Amino acid sequence: GQIRRQRQMCIRDSFSNGDIDGFDFQWGGRLYGVGDYSYQNIKKTQRQKMTIGGEEVVEIDINASYLTILHGISGYPLPKRDDLYAIGGYNRTVVKAWITATIGHHGFHSRWPKNAIQEIKDAGIDKPAELTMGLLQPVILDHFPMLADWPSQKVTWADLMFTESEIIIGTMLELMHSYGIACFSVHDSIIVRKSDQQIAMETLKDQFFRRTGIEPRLKVN
């Protein structure tokens, strides 16, 4: 007969900035799988081999999650393209690396951080040496003007992560309580059975809109 190995799964809710005055569990808040064998730690292609109740799964991603949230809370409409990072003229991985590095920082970088360089290298891209953070900055800000005052904004990466986490947790709870649907989180994406894809996407969009006033672009893997 067929033998299936099962593991008990635990998740923890991890908050940030606990040593800052005014902390009240309002920063961070991502769900993390506990242990080295968490489904969150394996490649997306491996997660596609998961099953829920013996059924194939799909992973539903929020495109440019933090950037989309920032559009919503800043009152800017989303650009009319499926991928926010595809601004034209520049590789989307380089654009994403610039935005990720900036949003994760308190201001604008004067040079590429090591993790951004590694992200670009891992994608197999040879970034031109002359393409500095400073050179790319006006191009990015022209497409995403809400980032122009990022160094002085009160909103930080921890606020964006909390909003994203509330959206994901709200989606999981609604799917469970209203529809009896099992759902696993991977930070800015959710995993559900293939047969639950449509209702899961509708629920995720609704939860996102409730908290940001904007509807996200979703991608299904």
Model-derived regions: residue spans:
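Catalytic phosphate/metal-binding cores of nucleic-acid and nucleotide-processing enzymes, i.e., regions
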Residues: 1, 60, 176, 190
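Catalytic palm active-site di-aspartate
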Residues: 61, 99, 181-192
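Active-site palm subdomain of RNA-directed nucleic acid polymerases
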Residues: 166-186
